[in-house]
C-alpha cells in the first residue's frame, strides 16, 4: 500500500511539472541534436559509441535523454512513471523521425521487459523517489546483458544545497552545506 501511495504521488507530481514546464522536464534542444552523442556523453563515460546498442533509459522520460540516445544510433526503450514525460518522448521522437519504445511504469517493476535485453541501462537521479532500492537493482540486473553497463546518477544532501563552480582541478562549493535557510529553487 505504501509503495503505491508513493508511486501515485510521484506520478502526479511529475505529470504536473511537465504541464507547468518546470525544472527537469525540458526536451532536447536543436543544438543537442546536432551532436547527440556529445550531448549525452559529455564526460566520456560511454565508450565505443551507441550505434546498434540496446539502451534502457530508466526513469528517463521527458524528451531529453531517450531521443538523444536514439539519434545517436541506439535502440532505445524508456520507462518512466509519468505519462506526461512519456508523451514528451513520443512527441520528440515523432517530430525527429526517431524510433523508440516508451513505456509508463515504475523502475522497481520492469516485468514488461525480457531478461538480458540491454547493453546499457542509464538512469538519471531518480532512486531517491523509490522506497525499496533492492527491487530497482534486482530489475536492472535482470534486464542488463552480461557485459553490459549501468550508468546511474545519484544525489547527496550537499548537491541540493550547493552550486559547484568548476576549476581545473575540481569544484568549489559556492553555498554553505550548513545553510539554515530553505533549499535554493
Region locations from a protein language model:
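A short glycine-rich, Lys/Arg-flanked "PGG" loop and its adjoining helix->strand segment in the class I
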Residues: 134-149
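Class I SAM-dependent methyltransferase SAM/SAH-binding core
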Residues: 54-109
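Conserved class I S-adenosyl-L-methionine
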Residues: 1-51, 64-65, 92, 149-184
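Nucleotide donor/acceptor-binding cores
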Residues: 52-54, 116
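A short SAM/SAH-binding and catalytic strip from SAM-dependent methyltransferases
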Residues: 119-134
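A short acidic, Gly/Pro-enriched loop at the edge of an enzyme's catalytic core
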Residues: 111-121
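Hydrophobic residues in well-ordered beta-strands that form the structural core
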Residues: 78, 122, 152-154
Amino acid at each position: 500500500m505504501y509503495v503505491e501511495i508513493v508511486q501515485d504521488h510521484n506520478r502526479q507530481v511529475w505529470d504536473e511539472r511537465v504541464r507547468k514546464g518546470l525544472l527537469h522536464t525540458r526536451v532536447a534542444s536543436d543544438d543537442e541534436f546536432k551532436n547527440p552523442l556529445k550531448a549525452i556523453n559529455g564526460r566520456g563515460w560511454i565508450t565505443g559509441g551507441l550505434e546498434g546498442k540496446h539502451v534502457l533509459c530508466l526513469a528517463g522520460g521527458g524528451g531529453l535523454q531517450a531521443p538523444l540516445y536514439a539519434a545517436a544510433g541506439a535502440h532505445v526503450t524508456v520507462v518512466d512513471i509519468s505519462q506526461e514525460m512519456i508523451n514528451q518522448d513520443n512527441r520528440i521522437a515523432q517530430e525527429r523521425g526517431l524510433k523508440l519504445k516508451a513505456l509508463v511504469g515504475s523502475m522497481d517493476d520492469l516485468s514488461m521487459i525480457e531478461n538480458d535485453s540491454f547493453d546499457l541501462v542509464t538512469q538519471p537521479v531518480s532512486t531517491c523517489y523509490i522506497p525499496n532500492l533492492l527491487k530497482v537493482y534486482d530489475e536492472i540486473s535482470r534486464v542488463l546483458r552480461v557485459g553490459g553497463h549501468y550508468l546511474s546518477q545519484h544525489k547527496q544532501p550537499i548537491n541540493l544545497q550547493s552550486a559547484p563552480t568548476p576549476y581545473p582541478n575540481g569544484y568549489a562549493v559556492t553555498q554553505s552545506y550548513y545553510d539554515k535557510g530553505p533549499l535554493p529553487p
